[in-house]
A protein has these predicted regions:
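Short alpha-helical transmembrane segments in multi-pass integral membrane proteins
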Residues: 1-26, 84-151, 195-248, 311-376, ...
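Residue-level signal for short hydrophobic patches within transmembrane helices
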Residues: 19-38, 42, 65-72, 148, ...
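Transmembrane helical elements of multi-pass membrane transporters/channels
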Residues: 24-43, 145, 179, 208-212, ...
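Transmembrane alpha-helix boundary and packing residues in multipass membrane permease domains
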Residues: 29, 33, 45, 82, ...
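Helix-terminus/linker motif at the lipid-water interface of multi-pass membrane proteins
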Residues: 34, 38-57, 126-133, 189-196, ...
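Small-residue-rich hydrophobic transmembrane alpha-helices
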Residues: 56-116, 153-172, 265, 283-343, ...
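Short runs within selected transmembrane alpha-helices of multi-pass transporters and secretion channels
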Residues: 77, 146-164, 172-183, 201-214, ...
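Transmembrane alpha-helical segments of integral membrane proteins
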Residues: 411-420
Length: 457
Protein backbone atom coordinates (compact mmCIF):
# COMPACT_ATOMS: atom_id res chain seq x y z
CA UNK A 1 0.00 0.00 0.00
CA UNK A 2 1.17 3.55 -0.71
CA UNK A 3 2.35 5.01 2.62
CA UNK A 4 0.65 8.31 1.88
CA UNK A 5 -2.70 6.58 1.32
CA UNK A 6 -2.24 4.54 4.50
CA UNK A 7 -1.52 7.72 6.46
CA UNK A 8 -4.53 9.34 4.81
CA UNK A 9 -6.83 6.51 5.90
CA UNK A 10 -5.64 6.77 9.51
CA UNK A 11 -5.78 10.56 9.69
CA UNK A 12 -8.12 11.60 12.55
CA UNK A 13 -9.52 14.40 10.36
CA UNK A 14 -11.28 11.71 8.35
CA UNK A 15 -12.40 9.33 11.10
CA UNK A 16 -12.72 11.09 14.49
CA UNK A 17 -16.16 12.26 15.73
CA UNK A 18 -16.94 15.70 14.29
CA UNK A 19 -17.97 17.30 17.58
CA UNK A 20 -14.78 16.48 19.46
CA UNK A 21 -12.65 17.12 16.37
CA UNK A 22 -14.18 20.57 15.85
CA UNK A 23 -13.69 21.42 19.52
CA UNK A 24 -10.06 20.29 19.35
CA UNK A 25 -9.29 22.59 16.42
CA UNK A 26 -11.76 25.42 17.01
CA UNK A 27 -11.01 26.19 20.66
CA UNK A 28 -7.30 26.90 20.08
CA UNK A 29 -8.19 28.81 16.89
CA UNK A 30 -10.75 30.92 18.78
CA UNK A 31 -8.22 31.67 21.50
CA UNK A 32 -5.63 32.61 18.87
CA UNK A 33 -8.10 34.90 17.09
CA UNK A 34 -9.16 36.47 20.39
CA UNK A 35 -5.53 37.07 21.26
CA UNK A 36 -4.99 38.76 17.88
CA UNK A 37 -8.02 40.94 18.59
CA UNK A 38 -6.68 41.71 22.06
CA UNK A 39 -3.46 43.05 20.57
CA UNK A 40 -5.59 45.96 19.36
CA UNK A 41 -8.16 46.08 22.15
CA UNK A 42 -5.70 46.04 25.07
CA UNK A 43 -3.80 48.92 23.47
CA UNK A 44 -7.07 50.79 22.93
CA UNK A 45 -8.16 50.32 26.56
CA UNK A 46 -4.86 51.43 28.09
CA UNK A 47 -4.39 54.25 25.58
CA UNK A 48 -7.96 55.41 26.18
CA UNK A 49 -7.38 55.41 29.94
CA UNK A 50 -3.92 57.00 29.71
CA UNK A 51 -4.18 59.36 26.73
CA UNK A 52 -7.92 59.94 26.36
CA UNK A 53 -10.31 60.39 23.45
CA UNK A 54 -7.62 61.62 21.04
CA UNK A 55 -5.63 58.46 21.74
CA UNK A 56 -8.70 56.37 20.88
CA UNK A 57 -9.17 58.37 17.69
CA UNK A 58 -5.49 57.87 16.76
CA UNK A 59 -5.67 54.09 17.13
CA UNK A 60 -8.78 54.10 14.94
CA UNK A 61 -6.91 56.04 12.25
CA UNK A 62 -4.08 53.51 12.56
CA UNK A 63 -6.39 50.50 12.37
CA UNK A 64 -6.27 50.14 8.55
CA UNK A 65 -2.50 49.55 8.87
CA UNK A 66 -3.10 46.46 10.99
CA UNK A 67 -6.01 45.36 8.80
CA UNK A 68 -3.98 45.58 5.59
CA UNK A 69 -1.17 43.58 7.21
CA UNK A 70 -3.70 41.02 8.39
CA UNK A 71 -4.96 40.77 4.81
CA UNK A 72 -1.48 39.79 3.62
CA UNK A 73 -1.08 37.31 6.48
CA UNK A 74 -4.45 35.63 5.83
CA UNK A 75 -3.96 35.62 2.06
CA UNK A 76 -0.80 33.56 2.47
CA UNK A 77 -1.58 31.79 5.75
CA UNK A 78 -5.11 30.58 5.02
CA UNK A 79 -4.29 30.06 1.34
CA UNK A 80 -1.25 27.99 2.26
CA UNK A 81 -3.07 26.04 4.98
CA UNK A 82 -6.10 25.31 2.77
CA UNK A 83 -3.92 24.02 -0.07
CA UNK A 84 -1.81 22.04 2.39
CA UNK A 85 -4.88 20.26 3.79
CA UNK A 86 -6.37 19.59 0.36
CA UNK A 87 -3.11 18.07 -0.90
CA UNK A 88 -2.64 16.02 2.27
CA UNK A 89 -6.23 14.78 1.98
CA UNK A 90 -5.44 13.68 -1.58
CA UNK A 91 -2.28 11.89 -0.37
CA UNK A 92 0.23 14.34 -1.97
CA UNK A 93 2.49 14.96 1.02
CA UNK A 94 5.55 16.34 -0.82
CA UNK A 95 3.52 18.90 -2.75
CA UNK A 96 1.74 19.93 0.44
CA UNK A 97 5.08 20.62 2.15
CA UNK A 98 6.35 22.67 -0.79
CA UNK A 99 3.22 24.82 -0.57
CA UNK A 100 3.79 25.42 3.15
CA UNK A 101 7.41 26.41 2.52
CA UNK A 102 6.46 28.86 -0.22
CA UNK A 103 3.85 30.44 2.05
CA UNK A 104 6.26 30.88 4.97
CA UNK A 105 8.95 32.67 2.96
CA UNK A 106 6.47 34.91 1.18
CA UNK A 107 4.94 35.92 4.52
CA UNK A 108 8.28 37.39 5.61
CA UNK A 109 8.89 39.17 2.29
CA UNK A 110 5.38 40.65 2.29
CA UNK A 111 5.60 41.86 5.89
CA UNK A 112 8.85 43.71 5.23
CA UNK A 113 7.41 45.27 2.07
CA UNK A 114 4.24 46.54 3.79
CA UNK A 115 6.28 48.03 6.65
CA UNK A 116 8.59 49.85 4.23
CA UNK A 117 5.69 51.35 2.26
CA UNK A 118 3.97 52.61 5.41
CA UNK A 119 7.13 54.22 6.81
CA UNK A 120 7.99 55.86 3.49
CA UNK A 121 4.53 57.38 2.98
CA UNK A 122 3.41 57.78 6.59
CA UNK A 123 1.93 61.31 6.59
CA UNK A 124 -0.05 61.12 3.33
CA UNK A 125 -1.35 57.68 4.33
CA UNK A 126 -2.63 58.98 7.68
CA UNK A 127 -4.39 61.88 5.93
CA UNK A 128 -5.92 59.34 3.54
CA UNK A 129 -7.00 57.19 6.51
CA UNK A 130 -9.01 60.15 7.85
CA UNK A 131 -6.77 61.84 10.45
CA UNK A 132 -7.78 65.32 11.58
CA UNK A 133 -5.19 67.97 12.47
CA UNK A 134 -5.85 67.32 16.16
CA UNK A 135 -5.38 63.55 15.90
CA UNK A 136 -2.41 63.57 13.48
CA UNK A 137 0.44 63.90 16.06
CA UNK A 138 -0.90 60.96 18.07
CA UNK A 139 -1.46 58.82 14.97
CA UNK A 140 2.04 59.58 13.66
CA UNK A 141 3.67 58.53 16.95
CA UNK A 142 1.64 55.32 17.06
CA UNK A 143 1.90 54.13 13.46
CA UNK A 144 5.61 54.93 13.03
CA UNK A 145 6.33 52.37 15.77
CA UNK A 146 3.63 49.83 14.87
CA UNK A 147 5.04 49.60 11.33
CA UNK A 148 8.33 48.23 12.71
CA UNK A 149 6.50 45.18 14.03
CA UNK A 150 4.54 44.38 10.87
CA UNK A 151 6.99 41.75 9.46
CA UNK A 152 6.76 39.87 12.77
CA UNK A 153 2.98 40.32 12.94
CA UNK A 154 2.52 38.99 9.40
CA UNK A 155 4.72 35.93 10.03
CA UNK A 156 2.97 35.22 13.32
CA UNK A 157 -0.61 35.43 12.01
CA UNK A 158 0.06 33.60 8.74
CA UNK A 159 2.45 31.07 10.25
CA UNK A 160 -0.07 30.04 12.89
CA UNK A 161 -2.53 28.97 10.19
CA UNK A 162 0.14 26.64 8.80
CA UNK A 163 0.91 25.33 12.29
CA UNK A 164 -2.78 24.46 12.76
CA UNK A 165 -2.80 22.78 9.35
CA UNK A 166 0.18 20.75 10.58
CA UNK A 167 -2.09 19.37 13.32
CA UNK A 168 -0.60 21.46 16.14
CA UNK A 169 -3.46 23.78 17.16
CA UNK A 170 -2.32 23.99 20.78
CA UNK A 171 1.15 25.24 19.82
CA UNK A 172 -0.46 27.78 17.50
CA UNK A 173 -2.58 29.02 20.38
CA UNK A 174 0.48 29.22 22.62
CA UNK A 175 2.33 31.38 20.07
CA UNK A 176 -0.33 34.06 20.02
CA UNK A 177 -1.22 33.79 23.69
CA UNK A 178 2.39 34.33 24.79
CA UNK A 179 2.73 37.47 22.69
CA UNK A 180 -0.57 38.84 23.97
CA UNK A 181 0.35 38.25 27.61
CA UNK A 182 3.63 40.11 27.10
CA UNK A 183 1.75 42.94 25.37
CA UNK A 184 -0.76 43.15 28.22
CA UNK A 185 2.00 43.30 30.86
CA UNK A 186 4.03 45.92 29.01
CA UNK A 187 1.10 48.21 28.09
CA UNK A 188 0.49 49.66 31.58
CA UNK A 189 4.22 49.62 32.35
CA UNK A 190 5.13 51.65 29.26
CA UNK A 191 2.06 53.94 29.18
CA UNK A 192 1.70 54.72 32.90
CA UNK A 193 4.97 53.59 34.51
CA UNK A 194 7.44 55.01 31.98
CA UNK A 195 4.93 57.71 30.92
CA UNK A 196 5.53 56.99 27.23
CA UNK A 197 1.87 57.60 26.39
CA UNK A 198 0.68 56.36 23.02
CA UNK A 199 4.24 55.41 22.04
CA UNK A 200 4.34 53.02 24.98
CA UNK A 201 1.25 51.22 23.73
CA UNK A 202 2.83 50.85 20.31
CA UNK A 203 6.12 49.46 21.67
CA UNK A 204 4.26 46.97 23.88
CA UNK A 205 2.41 45.67 20.83
CA UNK A 206 5.57 45.35 18.73
CA UNK A 207 7.47 43.43 21.43
CA UNK A 208 4.57 40.99 21.82
CA UNK A 209 4.48 40.44 18.06
CA UNK A 210 8.23 39.77 17.93
CA UNK A 211 7.92 37.08 20.61
CA UNK A 212 5.01 35.40 18.78
CA UNK A 213 6.98 35.37 15.52
CA UNK A 214 10.03 33.84 17.22
CA UNK A 215 7.85 31.01 18.54
CA UNK A 216 6.54 30.37 15.00
CA UNK A 217 10.11 30.11 13.71
CA UNK A 218 11.01 27.72 16.55
CA UNK A 219 8.08 25.47 15.62
CA UNK A 220 9.10 25.11 11.99
CA UNK A 221 12.75 24.51 12.88
CA UNK A 222 12.26 22.05 15.76
CA UNK A 223 8.70 20.80 16.29
CA UNK A 224 7.00 20.54 12.89
CA UNK A 225 5.25 17.32 11.84
CA UNK A 226 5.43 18.05 8.10
CA UNK A 227 8.53 17.27 6.06
CA UNK A 228 10.21 20.57 5.24
CA UNK A 229 13.74 21.20 4.00
CA UNK A 230 15.47 24.39 2.89
CA UNK A 231 14.80 23.82 -0.80
CA UNK A 232 11.05 23.95 -0.07
CA UNK A 233 11.38 27.47 1.40
CA UNK A 234 12.09 28.96 -2.03
CA UNK A 235 8.76 30.38 -3.28
CA UNK A 236 7.48 28.72 -6.44
CA UNK A 237 5.14 30.64 -8.72
CA UNK A 238 2.86 27.65 -9.32
CA UNK A 239 2.37 27.23 -5.56
CA UNK A 240 1.90 30.95 -4.97
CA UNK A 241 -0.89 30.95 -7.55
CA UNK A 242 -2.64 28.13 -5.70
CA UNK A 243 -2.07 29.83 -2.35
CA UNK A 244 -3.43 33.20 -3.46
CA UNK A 245 -6.38 31.51 -5.16
CA UNK A 246 -7.64 29.96 -1.92
CA UNK A 247 -6.41 32.75 0.36
CA UNK A 248 -7.85 35.54 -1.74
CA UNK A 249 -11.26 35.42 -0.08
CA UNK A 250 -9.82 36.05 3.38
CA UNK A 251 -7.34 38.63 2.10
CA UNK A 252 -9.98 40.52 0.16
CA UNK A 253 -12.26 40.46 3.19
CA UNK A 254 -9.60 42.24 5.25
CA UNK A 255 -8.89 44.72 2.44
CA UNK A 256 -12.63 45.37 2.27
CA UNK A 257 -12.68 45.98 6.02
CA UNK A 258 -9.78 48.44 5.62
CA UNK A 259 -11.59 50.18 2.75
CA UNK A 260 -14.73 50.55 4.85
CA UNK A 261 -12.65 51.88 7.76
CA UNK A 262 -10.95 54.46 5.56
CA UNK A 263 -14.17 55.58 3.87
CA UNK A 264 -15.99 55.66 7.20
CA UNK A 265 -13.25 57.74 8.88
CA UNK A 266 -13.44 60.28 6.08
CA UNK A 267 -17.26 60.30 6.18
CA UNK A 268 -17.11 60.83 9.95
CA UNK A 269 -14.56 63.61 9.55
CA UNK A 270 -16.77 65.39 6.98
CA UNK A 271 -20.25 64.91 8.47
CA UNK A 272 -19.01 65.04 12.06
CA UNK A 273 -17.68 68.55 11.50
CA UNK A 274 -21.23 69.64 10.60
CA UNK A 275 -22.78 67.95 13.66
CA UNK A 276 -22.96 68.78 17.34
CA UNK A 277 -20.34 66.08 18.02
CA UNK A 278 -17.51 67.47 15.87
CA UNK A 279 -15.15 65.15 13.94
CA UNK A 280 -13.01 63.66 16.70
CA UNK A 281 -15.80 62.18 18.85
CA UNK A 282 -17.33 60.05 16.04
CA UNK A 283 -13.90 58.88 14.85
CA UNK A 284 -12.96 57.81 18.40
CA UNK A 285 -16.32 56.13 19.08
CA UNK A 286 -16.48 54.21 15.82
CA UNK A 287 -12.96 52.95 16.52
CA UNK A 288 -14.07 51.60 19.88
CA UNK A 289 -17.09 49.82 18.37
CA UNK A 290 -14.88 48.34 15.64
CA UNK A 291 -12.53 46.93 18.28
CA UNK A 292 -15.42 45.50 20.32
CA UNK A 293 -16.86 43.91 17.18
CA UNK A 294 -13.46 42.31 16.59
CA UNK A 295 -14.00 40.17 19.70
CA UNK A 296 -17.25 38.78 18.31
CA UNK A 297 -15.82 38.24 14.83
CA UNK A 298 -12.69 36.64 16.30
CA UNK A 299 -14.80 33.89 17.84
CA UNK A 300 -16.83 33.23 14.67
CA UNK A 301 -13.75 33.28 12.45
CA UNK A 302 -11.95 31.06 14.98
CA UNK A 303 -14.76 28.51 14.68
CA UNK A 304 -14.41 28.69 10.89
CA UNK A 305 -10.63 28.32 11.06
CA UNK A 306 -10.96 25.35 13.38
CA UNK A 307 -13.37 23.75 10.92
CA UNK A 308 -11.25 24.45 7.83
CA UNK A 309 -8.83 21.50 8.20
CA UNK A 310 -11.85 19.20 8.69
CA UNK A 311 -13.72 20.65 5.71
CA UNK A 312 -10.65 20.63 3.46
CA UNK A 313 -9.44 17.13 4.30
CA UNK A 314 -12.86 15.46 4.07
CA UNK A 315 -13.78 17.30 0.89
CA UNK A 316 -10.50 16.15 -0.65
CA UNK A 317 -11.23 12.62 0.58
CA UNK A 318 -14.85 12.83 -0.76
CA UNK A 319 -16.37 12.30 2.68
CA UNK A 320 -19.16 14.79 2.08
CA UNK A 321 -21.35 13.75 5.02
CA UNK A 322 -18.57 14.83 7.36
CA UNK A 323 -18.27 18.15 5.53
CA UNK A 324 -22.02 18.80 5.93
CA UNK A 325 -22.01 17.79 9.58
CA UNK A 326 -19.06 20.08 10.32
CA UNK A 327 -20.90 23.01 8.70
CA UNK A 328 -24.00 22.38 10.82
CA UNK A 329 -21.99 22.26 14.04
CA UNK A 330 -20.07 25.42 13.10
CA UNK A 331 -23.19 27.37 12.10
CA UNK A 332 -24.93 26.46 15.35
CA UNK A 333 -21.94 27.55 17.43
CA UNK A 334 -21.64 30.86 15.56
CA UNK A 335 -25.34 31.63 16.02
CA UNK A 336 -25.22 30.98 19.77
CA UNK A 337 -22.16 33.21 20.18
CA UNK A 338 -23.72 35.93 18.01
CA UNK A 339 -26.88 35.99 20.13
CA UNK A 340 -24.88 36.39 23.35
CA UNK A 341 -22.95 39.33 21.90
CA UNK A 342 -26.15 40.92 20.58
CA UNK A 343 -27.61 40.93 24.09
CA UNK A 344 -24.43 42.43 25.55
CA UNK A 345 -24.34 45.21 22.95
CA UNK A 346 -27.98 46.12 23.54
CA UNK A 347 -28.03 45.84 27.34
CA UNK A 348 -24.61 47.16 28.40
CA UNK A 349 -23.43 49.79 25.89
CA UNK A 350 -22.35 52.32 28.53
CA UNK A 351 -20.23 49.79 30.40
CA UNK A 352 -18.61 48.55 27.19
CA UNK A 353 -17.69 52.05 26.00
CA UNK A 354 -16.52 53.05 29.49
CA UNK A 355 -13.79 50.39 29.44
CA UNK A 356 -11.98 52.49 26.84
CA UNK A 357 -11.66 55.62 28.98
CA UNK A 358 -13.80 58.60 29.91
CA UNK A 359 -15.24 61.40 27.85
CA UNK A 360 -17.89 64.09 27.69
CA UNK A 361 -21.63 63.47 27.80
CA UNK A 362 -21.73 63.97 24.02
CA UNK A 363 -19.02 61.34 23.63
CA UNK A 364 -20.97 58.71 25.55
CA UNK A 365 -24.26 59.70 23.92
CA UNK A 366 -22.89 59.11 20.43
CA UNK A 367 -20.92 55.97 21.38
CA UNK A 368 -23.84 54.19 23.04
CA UNK A 369 -26.27 55.08 20.27
CA UNK A 370 -23.81 53.95 17.59
CA UNK A 371 -23.07 50.64 19.36
CA UNK A 372 -26.76 49.77 19.74
CA UNK A 373 -27.81 50.66 16.20
CA UNK A 374 -24.78 49.60 14.16
CA UNK A 375 -24.62 46.20 15.91
CA UNK A 376 -28.41 45.62 15.87
CA UNK A 377 -28.19 42.51 13.64
CA UNK A 378 -25.22 40.94 15.43
CA UNK A 379 -27.26 37.80 16.19
CA UNK A 380 -27.31 36.98 12.44
CA UNK A 381 -23.80 38.20 11.64
CA UNK A 382 -21.73 35.07 12.30
CA UNK A 383 -22.81 32.98 9.31
CA UNK A 384 -21.28 35.20 6.61
CA UNK A 385 -17.59 35.07 7.71
CA UNK A 386 -17.93 31.39 8.58
CA UNK A 387 -19.35 30.60 5.12
CA UNK A 388 -16.50 32.47 3.44
CA UNK A 389 -14.05 30.18 5.25
CA UNK A 390 -16.13 27.14 4.31
CA UNK A 391 -16.04 27.82 0.58
CA UNK A 392 -12.32 28.62 0.68
CA UNK A 393 -11.44 25.41 2.51
CA UNK A 394 -13.24 23.19 -0.04
CA UNK A 395 -11.46 24.87 -2.95
CA UNK A 396 -14.40 27.06 -4.09
CA UNK A 397 -12.30 30.22 -4.26
CA UNK A 398 -14.80 32.30 -6.25
CA UNK A 399 -17.65 31.64 -3.84
CA UNK A 400 -15.31 32.34 -0.93
CA UNK A 401 -14.44 35.72 -2.43
CA UNK A 402 -18.11 36.56 -3.03
CA UNK A 403 -18.95 35.68 0.57
CA UNK A 404 -16.06 37.82 1.82
CA UNK A 405 -17.18 40.82 -0.22
CA UNK A 406 -20.92 40.76 0.51
CA UNK A 407 -21.11 42.64 3.80
CA UNK A 408 -18.14 44.99 3.50
CA UNK A 409 -18.02 45.96 -0.18
CA UNK A 410 -21.29 45.03 -1.86
CA UNK A 411 -23.61 46.25 0.91
CA UNK A 412 -21.93 48.27 3.69
CA UNK A 413 -19.57 50.47 1.67
CA UNK A 414 -22.25 52.01 -0.60
CA UNK A 415 -24.67 52.43 2.30
CA UNK A 416 -22.06 54.23 4.42
CA UNK A 417 -21.63 56.72 1.57
CA UNK A 418 -25.32 57.12 0.60
CA UNK A 419 -27.16 57.19 3.95
CA UNK A 420 -25.30 60.20 5.45
CA UNK A 421 -26.31 62.27 2.42
CA UNK A 422 -29.89 62.10 3.69
CA UNK A 423 -29.47 61.43 7.43
CA UNK A 424 -26.23 63.17 8.32
CA UNK A 425 -23.82 61.36 10.60
CA UNK A 426 -26.62 59.09 11.89
CA UNK A 427 -26.71 57.47 8.45
CA UNK A 428 -23.47 55.64 9.22
CA UNK A 429 -25.19 53.85 12.11
CA UNK A 430 -28.12 52.51 10.10
CA UNK A 431 -25.92 51.18 7.30
CA UNK A 432 -24.65 48.40 9.59
CA UNK A 433 -27.81 46.36 10.32
CA UNK A 434 -29.07 46.63 6.73
CA UNK A 435 -25.76 45.34 5.36
CA UNK A 436 -25.76 42.53 7.95
CA UNK A 437 -29.26 41.40 6.95
CA UNK A 438 -28.44 41.26 3.24
CA UNK A 439 -25.13 39.45 3.81
CA UNK A 440 -26.80 36.87 6.06
CA UNK A 441 -29.49 36.05 3.49
CA UNK A 442 -26.94 35.67 0.70
CA UNK A 443 -24.68 33.42 2.81
CA UNK A 444 -27.56 31.11 3.71
CA UNK A 445 -28.65 30.80 0.07
CA UNK A 446 -25.17 29.95 -1.24
CA UNK A 447 -24.35 27.56 1.60
CA UNK A 448 -27.61 25.62 1.32
CA UNK A 449 -27.07 25.23 -2.41
CA UNK A 450 -23.52 23.89 -1.99
CA UNK A 451 -24.42 21.55 0.86
CA UNK A 452 -27.36 20.26 -1.18
CA UNK A 453 -24.99 19.30 -3.99
CA UNK A 454 -22.89 17.29 -1.53
CA UNK A 455 -25.96 15.51 -0.19
CA UNK A 456 -26.82 14.29 -3.68
CA UNK A 457 -23.23 13.43 -4.66
Amino acid sequence: MNPSNSSNADNPLGIAPIGSLLAKFAIPAIISMLVNALYNIVDQIFIGQGVGMLGNAATNIAFPVTTISTAAALLLGIGGASNYNLEMGAGKEHKASEIAGSALTTLVITGVSVAAIILLFLHPLLVFFGATDTVMPYATDYVSIIAIGLPFFTLSVGGNHLIRADRSPTYSMMCTLTGAIINTILDPLFIFGFKWGIKGGAWATVIGQVVSAILVVIYFTKFRKMYLDRSMLKPKLIHLRAITSLGLASGINQIAIAAVQIVMNNILRYYGAASVYGSDIPIACVGIVSKVNMVFLAICIGISQGAQPIWGFNYGARKYDRVRQTYRYSATACTIIATIFFLCFQLFPHQIVGMFGGGSNLYFKFAEKYLRIFMLLTFANGIQPMSAGFFTSIGKATLGIIMSLTRQVIFLLPLVVIFPMFMGIDGVMYAGPIADTAAFILAVVFARKELGKMKNA
